[in-house]
A protein has these predicted regions:
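N-terminal acidic leader/helix
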Residues: 1-27
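Detector for the mature cores of small, proteolytically processed
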Residues: 29-66
Length: 66
């Protein structure tokens, strides 16, 4: 993933959390044979992930999902 794409995706996650008044209180990095991503959680529930592969920059879950 290019650095600019990474920063734009990270900003999108942060902006959506701010808009919806969601506090991201945990960030985990997953890197194994299947996942290469950064997961963002609020109160123990995953609300977004930032995919570090070519498949797509980010996904939203739960309270951050449309």
């Amino acid at each position: 993933m290019e650095f600019e794409v990474f920063i734009n995706a990270l900003n999108e996650i942060v902006d959506r959390a701010k808009e919806r008044d969601v506090e991201i209180d945990e960030v985990d990095i997953l890197a194994d044979n299947y996942y290469n991503c950064i997961q963002f959680s609020s109160k123990g529930i995953i609300v977004a992930d930032l995919d570090l592969t070519e498949s797509g920059p980010y996904n939203f879950y739960g309270v951050l999902r449309d």
